[in-house]
């Protein structure tokens, strides 16, 4: 009688500890996007990489059947995949990573901060318009929460200032 009980406890612990860890393994950038972030070291161009990555998530969210040109696919890799909530979380994380890169550049007094910030804010304004149209397509609470967080992060970017 002890064996089945111990087995059940072990199984429950394994499953409950394993699932959250699995959920955290998702990377917000594709392999090609990561390569571009590593390769492009000039601040304003690196921010453009993050903008492109964020735009790709919005493209898939707005049009799940979206296609890209062969040239785009060679450069950026396949379009990102995932649930609506995952793509929105990826979008938010991309913005947060870009903000971190801007903060790092600020600490180094990078002369390109105003240019990079201007590009970032303008892109976030355009993305906000598209994000706001997605609410009608969201059916689950998890999706609505992810959308709300993505919108909040984009709004934060639009208010950003070079210090």
Q: What label would you give each PLM region?
A:
Residues 1-5:
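Positively charged n-region of N-terminal signal peptides that target proteins for export
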Residues 7-18:
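Bacterial N-terminal signal peptides
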Residues 23-163:
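Long, charged/polar, soluble alpha-helical segments
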């Amino acid at each position: 009688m002890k064996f089945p009980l111990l087995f059940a406890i072990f199984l429950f612990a394994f499953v409950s500890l394993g699932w959250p860890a699995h959920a955290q393994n998702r990377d917000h950038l594709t392999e090609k996007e990561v390569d571009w972030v590593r390769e492009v070291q000039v601040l304003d161009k690196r921010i453009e990489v993050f903008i492109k990555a964020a735009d790709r998530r919005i493209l898939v969210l707005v049009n799940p059947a979206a296609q890209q040109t062969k040239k785009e696919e060679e450069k950026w890799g396949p379009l990102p995949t995932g649930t609506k909530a995952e793509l929105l979380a990826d979008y938010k994380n991309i913005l947060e990573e870009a903000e971190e890169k801007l903060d790092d550049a600020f600490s180094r007094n990078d002369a390109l901060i105003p240019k990079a910030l201007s590009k970032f804010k303008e892109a976030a304004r355009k993305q906000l318009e598209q994000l706001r149209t997605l609410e009608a397509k969201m059916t689950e609470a998890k999706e609505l929460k992810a959308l709300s967080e993505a919108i909040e992060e984009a709004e934060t970017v639009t208010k950003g200032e070079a210090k």
